[in-house]
């Protein structure tokens, strides 16, 4: 399954990208689609088949599952 991960800050996205390089996860830093945010920002496109709890951290704001050109919100951080 493909996911797009949104973060509270761009620096958190960069930090997570560095984490990915040192892990077995497949992902890349991307500019966020306008459908998902009104602000300019970076996020992570992640290809992942396990339980999302393995990648969730306090820096993650939202996670969307990607199905073609559709996005389904599957995780939102508590406010």
Regions found by a protein language model. Name each.
Residues 1, 21, 26-44:
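Amphipathic, hydrophobic secondary-structure cores in small proteins
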Residues 11-24, 51:
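Short amphipathic alpha-helix segments
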Residues 48-79:
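C-terminal structural segments of small proteins and small subunits
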